[in-house]
Regions:
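Ubiquitous "structural anchor" signal
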Residues: 67, 95-96, 148
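Short cytosolic juxtamembrane segments of multi-pass membrane proteins
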Residues: 148-154
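Transmembrane helix boundary and interhelical loop/hinge segments in multi-pass membrane proteins
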Residues: 1-4, 154
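Extended hydrophobic-aromatic, low-complexity segments
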Residues: 72-73, 113, 154
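Hydrophobic alpha-helical interface/terminus motif in multipass membrane transporters
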Residues: 28-32, 62, 66, 86, ...
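Alpha-helical transmembrane segments and their short interhelical loops
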Residues: 3-76, 81, 126-133, 137, ...
């Protein structure tokens, strides 16, 4: 099997699962928290799909660098932990010094969080979110290209 075919199949399966997960999460928010979804479902799906592909690329790149299968989890945590801390997952990145805000906004998880929040909670159109989408496209594209180059079957 060619590496490209394998990686595309992996990305496609992740996209299908992600669509189901996002739909269930939105439904849960609407039913139990009376959340109003102000953005279009198409925009939300596109942002979530792009986020899924972005982090699929980051994950594959990280895993491709591991020498042993046992070290993949540790490497993923090493990459993701700073993003969880800085990207506004647990608390607003606005609490960090203004000096590092540009770096935080260049992280793919920050772009994904901000884009989803803006679309779902504020109804921000997709075209107004192009800087966030560009961050995710760059991270995902570069990660996938490097993962294809460095991916090992052994």
């Amino acid at each position: 099997m060619r590496r490209t075919d394998f990686l595309l199949a992996l990305a496609s399966s992740r996209l299908i699962l992600m669509i189901i997960e996002v739909g269930l999460l939105l439904l849960f928010g609407v039913l139990f928290f009376h959340m109003r979804v102000l953005g279009s479902i198409g925009s939300i799906a596109l942002i979530a799909g792009l986020g899924s592909l972005t982090f699929g690329g980051v994950g594959l790149l990280t895993a491709s660098r591991a020498q042993k299968i046992e070290s993949v989890s540790g490497l993923i945590n090493l990459v993701m932990m700073p993003m969880w801390i800085f990207s506004g997952v647990f608390f607003s990145y606005e609490r960090f010094p203004n000096l590092i805000h540009p770096l935080i906004k260049a992280l793919p998880l920050t772009a994904l969080n901000d884009a989803l929040r803006a679309s779902i909670l504020e109804g921000t159109p997709l075209l107004q979110q192009w800087p966030r989408l560009l961050v995710m496209i760059l991270w995902g594209g570069i990660s996938f290209v490097l993962a294809l180059k460095w991916f090992r079957w052994t």
